[in-house]
Design a protein with these regions (language model features):
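Generic recognition of short, well-ordered alpha-helical segments
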Residues: 17-18, 43, 69
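Local sequence-structure signature of Cys/Sec-based thiol-disulfide redox active-site neighborhoods
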Residues: 1-26
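Structured beta->alpha junctions
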Residues: 11, 34-37, 60
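Short active-site oxyanion
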Residues: 4-6, 29-31, 60-62
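Non-catalytic, surface beta->alpha helical segment in thiol-disulfide oxidoreductase systems
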Residues: 58-82
Length: 82
């Protein structure tokens, strides 16, 4: 079973917009959680060990910031899981 990616963002964060656009461009479905406006999302983000955005989480894998190679590696490995 593949876990749907969760993207933690904040309004006005240029890096968040880049990751959102990257996921959309590659047709990867994801749930966006705005840690700046949603206290529950902020708590979830804190539980990952960071307050920084964007943070893409898929299962136990994480990518902090906009790093296309790391995003490709993470999303590709998760799509190949049974």
């Amino acid at each position: 079973m593949v876990t749907e990616p969760i993207l933690y963002t904040q309004a006005g964060c240029a890096e968040s917009a880049k990751v959102r656009a990257w996921l959309t461009d590659y047709g990867i479905a994801f749930t966006e959680r705005d840690a700046g406006r949603d206290p529950e999302a902020a708590q979830e983000l804190a539980e990952t060990g960071t307050f920084a955005t964007p943070l893409l989480v898929i299962g136990h894998g994480k990518v902090l910031g906009f790093h296309p190679k790391a995003l490709t590696d993470l999303t590709s490995s998760k799509q190949q899981e049974p």
